[in-house]
Amino acid sequence: PSDEFMHQLRTLTQESGVVLILDEIQSGYGRTGKFFAHQWSGIKADIVTMAKGICNGYPMGALICSPEFKPVYGMLGTTFGGNHLGCAGAIAVLEIFEKEQLVENARKVGEHLLTELKKIPGIKEVRGRGLMIGMEFDYPVKELRSRLIHEQHVFTGASGTNMIRLLPPLTLTIAQADEFITRLKSAL
């Protein structure tokens, strides 16, 4: 969503006394070039959910709550909560994020990809932030995605019938992004 939408949403929830819960399960953990996607708009949520990137593929989820919410003993029960291996993995992920500057890399490489993708004729619209990018076409992308995977050996996601989603690893380099651009042009 646009920054304007996020600001209006935050204002509306505050005026109405409604808790703002943001799902950052896919868009969080550096994917958009900020640690959480909603940080681009400068708003603060009451609750933020996260998973996926939190433990680099090991099953784990978490949430952050505003200090306005006070924990109550016995309020939360969970079968798998506090898994030691998951917690150790999550700490290691944060250490690697900092050491390898993965959030900054996602921002930098994502900006490069967005700029280059917008130059390609035949793509109706390119949108996104960081390494969470969508390319919209005027036609169904099923055959294009098939050519990408079978002829160019490039895996992409889809959203609807006319949208290709790009969610590459946060370690993607500019050179690898350029290789993708070359292969995409060949498939087009």
Feature names for model-found ranges:
Residues 1-188:
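Conserved N-terminal phosphate-binding loop of PLP-dependent enzymes in the Aspartate aminotransferase
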